[in-house]
Structure formats: structure tokens, C-alpha cells
């Protein structure tokens, strides 16, 4: 569970779950522009699965102990991911190359590039969202003249 494929949470017999960064805290959610994950579909399933775990106390990255409503926190995490997917899908009103999509996405979300390293990191953040739009059928891709174009499915 978590933002990276095959990440695990660990539970103890006394009702504590070490969830790491499988969920973002409310404070992080208020500031994050685009939650990171390797695979958006699996990330959403992970967040849903966390709500079914039988723990009363949680240890979260960027927060430490959390004894609040884990269902509510997971829902807020999933809502942000789904919101970003919907916003990014709207960009595909016209055919776009991956680079065009990334550029428009950065403008929409307010991500700025200052260095090449920032560009690469941002593309790593955006790629799973673009891939999820194709996986779930919201968008499709076509190759024309050795260039991949992404389209919104009607």
C-alpha cells in the first residue's frame, strides 16, 4: 500500500498501523499540487483498502501519530487524486503530445520549472495520471508520424 508499487503498511498486535506515506495528512493535502504515485489505479485501491484495516491508531509520514477517522482521511486523499484526473482529462480537448500535455498540466496545477531536475520530477509525477486516463478509457493514444498523440475519448 502507498504511493510506490509494492510498498507495505505494518500493523502491530496492539492496534497500531505504521502506514508511512500511504495516505497524505490533511496538512499535506492542503499544500500538495499533485499527489505522487507510481500507478494511480493501484494507489486508489490501496487507499480504499486501508479503510478496511482493523486498526485504531495510525503512524503516518509527515505527521506521526494519527487517531482520527482514517476513512475520512482516505476519502480526502482519493478525492484529490480523482479531482486531478478530471482536471487533467479536460486538457485533452484537442490531440496533444506527451510534452504538450505535461506543459499544459504544469500550467493548470501551478507547477513551475526552475531546473532540469524539477522538470524530470514533475514529469514523473504527471506520467501515472496520463497513463491512468488511458487505462480507464478516458483517453486514448495514437501514433502518427512517429509521434504519440493523446485524445479524450468521446
Per-region residue spans from a language model:
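C-terminal regulatory/interaction regions
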Residues: 90-154
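Metallo-beta-lactamase
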Residues: 6-82
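Short, small-residue-biased leader/transition segments that mark boundaries at the very start
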Residues: 1-5
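Pre-recognition alpha-helix immediately N-terminal to the DNA-recognition helix
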Residues: 83-91
